[in-house]
Amino acid sequence: LQALGFSIDDISRAIGSENVNVSGGDVVTDGVRRNLQVSGEFTNVEQIKNVVVKGGKGNVAYVRDLADVVETGKEQQSFARLDGKEVVTLAVLKKAGENLINAADQIEAIVADYQKTELPKNCTIVITNDQSTATRINLADLINSIIIGFILVTIVLMFFMGVQNAIFVGLATPLSAFLAFLVMPSLDFTFNIVVTFAFLLSIGIIVDDAVVVIENTHRLHTKEGIDIKTATKWAAAEVFAPVVAGTLTTLAPFFPLLFWPGLIGEFFVYLPSVLIITLTASLIVAYIFNPVFAVDFMDRKPRVLNRRRLFFIGLIGGALTVLGIVTGQTWIAVLAVFNLGFFLLNRFWITPKVIKPFQDKWLPALMNMYRSVLRWSISGNRAWFVVLGVVVMLVGTVFLMIVAGPQVVFFPSSDPNYAYVYIQTPQGTDAEVTDSITRIVEQRVQKIIGPKNPTVKSVISNVGLGAGDPQNPDRTVTPHKGKVTVAFVEYSKRHGDFTGRYLTLFRDALRDLPGVEIVVDKENSGPPTGKPINIEISGDDLDTLVAIQDRVKVLLTDSLRIGGIERLKSDLIRNKPEARVVIDREKANREGISTVQVGMALRNSLYGAEATKYRAGEEEYPVQLRVKEDMRHNADALLNLPLTFREMSSGQFRQVPMSAVAKVEYTSTFGGINRKNQKRVVTLGSNVLEGFNTNETNDQIRRAVAGLKIPEGYDIKLTGEQEDQQETGEFLGFAMMVALMLILVIMVTQFNSVAKPILIMTTVLFSLIGVLLGFIIFQMTVSIAITGIGVVALAGIVVRNGIVLVDFTDVLKKEGYRTRRAIIEGGAVRFNPVVLTAAATILGLIPLAVGLNINFWELINLRSPQIHLGSDSVAFWGPLAWSIVFGLSFATFLTLVVVPCMYFILYTVQLRLRRSRLHRAIREGVHNPTAHH
């Protein structure tokens, strides 16, 4: 170009002016109006080579004499491998609000069809990092847990209420869920994991209203001899107020959770919403559907099973079985055989041999034993000692929690499904260099995993593109970054292999790579939160911030060597390499050259200037003009390129090398500066190593930086996960206070008293004994967020039974019972519903708490039921389930024993106060006899 006196712009103009189609207007020939079209669009690459280029000085040349015209792709800035083999990756991102599972199914079908019809045999398409897999498994686990919980709840109800009544009550679950499903679409709710868990949590609570109504109907119908219609009306009316109040108190704790702020609140908002809808639906079912079922089907005695009825039932069961076999729908036949078998088993063995003896012998014995316990507890001053004993237990449990309590975390940590090894080389490192380092990391990871590891599904390596956090996908190319992703098989297929151990093995194997930042991490199982360790240093002067940052790093990692810190990584990039072109403005002005001219000339030489687009069929390809590769990698060679411009004085074209007016200075600069609240901020972040507690590690860091002397106007603050945890703890504490206030208002309205609601609400405080003792004894990790939600939810569940018990005791007193007898009889009559509602809630949560999984679809299709303990959902939701199980188990004892004792204490205190006022009035009357006249 320089020798012949041409510039890149000359070539660009020439190619652009030739590759055009121009409409010349309409022309009339032989009476026909035709559009005059000048067609000059290139049809092959040779035409580009033969374009004539005219220079500013009148010189002429072909493009082929000035440049090499080649068909090529963009410069490779990213690399990808799957299990060591080169691959091309295609990331498919789901639109917001669309069904993930449906999208995954459609993609899988399209890929399978394309594989068969379009691809050669030696080319395969593999779907990796399929997020729908985890979603399917979690949903299946939770749905199976719902079924197991429903079965357990129905079984326990059968013993207390009989099979028919248990089925009436059990129907409350699907009916309430159905009503909730009708409402959810109007709220734009999707069926996600949180929604599924909300339904699981509601299983045991849903049946509470139905248990109280049906049990009361059954008692009046069978024991009092009242006809079924009258018994149904009386039973529903008798418990209407306490049931409605109980439902409202159960709902009360969930209302504050609707206003949970931030991303965590957006994640959990489905939980209180679905529970409020479902529990409201359960109230409708209990008072509209269940009474109808009771009137139609409830009998004092089992119906006589005559031959005709038995033949009819057997005929239906046999027909369904044959239908299932003929149509190939095995599950229809299996369900038909199961239902027929259960019907016969119940008629001839379960009810007469198991349930009837339990109801006639064991349950009355249990009731008499309970009456004896109550009679003993409220004799003399024993009630005071019972309550005092519970208070001492509470104080002792809190002390034990402080001294020997379990670990506390923000969110529970589950066994990882993915392990990520993030590789970061110095800013400016070429993609090929980063790829060579990534290969070393990949080889070491493969060595640790071993060949054909049954726990590992795939190993994927990315360099440049797709090397960032999968939770925050960034499609920009970062040549200095790489990532190795290890995908593990589903939890049920790991056979006890703890995948978390691989993270430690990877860290140990990759410590010795010099000049490279290696971070080993796993996927986030909950809502998005900040880094486990996140230290923000804020101030005005950047150099001072850097100095403080370096002191903090040395203090924590070298001096104190605080355990658990993986690697403190700064978000401030200080060594971003830069080649700065400095223009001599005096020389440039003398030559008539502007800064823009120099800048655009360099940019076009490096990145290329698009002259035109070349069309091949339906595809368009940009025609880029830029200098050869060897020159693009040499800054001095680039500066020797000529600048072609017209001299204003003479009007002649001139060429001046850029080096005549500019020079290159090699330096480093900051990659970017963050600001927060108008102050510059530098952040140090790190993961916490396996086996270390995040809160304990952060406490050590907090104490360490508190003693660090820093200049005035500068601040060191722990943010990230710690800040989120503090905000969550404060919100849940506030939500608990609001919930208790709502519960108090509801109960004061019902009882028209303050003393009795406070009496019942003490069970909320005492139920913490069960929660804390459970976590201490079994050394379970306490989650601030998940356990906190459980404790808030527990508040409403606990007071429900207390309301039913106290309300019925008041009813008996109004009927003329003395207080002591009313307490004993009220407790005995309400013993069944109290135990049943507690047992239903506990058993409904047990499958999730222990992680019991049975694949019922596989079971009814006579395939492997895949029975196993543990799952990803258990690790996350388990603390919530256990907090309710522990708390409610202890609260049931409180309701049955301690609440009657406190009721008796309240009565004796009120009685003494009345006697005291009466004696005072009598004394005043004796001393002042004229006062009555």
Question: Can you name each region flagged by the protein language model?
Answer:
Residues L1, D65-A67, F79-I155, V194, ...:
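Juxtamembrane "pre-transmembrane" interface segments
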Residues D9-S23, F42-E75, E98, N102-I125, ...:
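Surface-exposed amphipathic alpha-helical segments in non-transmembrane regions
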Residues T128, T135, L139, I214, ...:
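Helix-loop junctions and hydrophobic alpha-helical segments within the transmembrane domains
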Residues I151-R219, F259, I277, L742-R830, ...:
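Hydrophobic transmembrane alpha-helices and their membrane-interface caps
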Residues I155, A166-L187, F267-I284, F312-G324, ...:
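Small-residue-enriched core segments of transmembrane alpha-helices in multipass membrane transport
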Residues P185, F189, L258-G265, R347-I355, ...:
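Transmembrane helices with small-residue packing motifs
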Residues I203, V207-T217, F240-F259, E266-F358, ...:
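Transmembrane alpha-helices and their membrane-interface boundaries in multi-pass membrane transporters
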Residues V239, V304-V409, I535, A828, ...:
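Signature of alpha-helical transmembrane segments and their immediate interfacial
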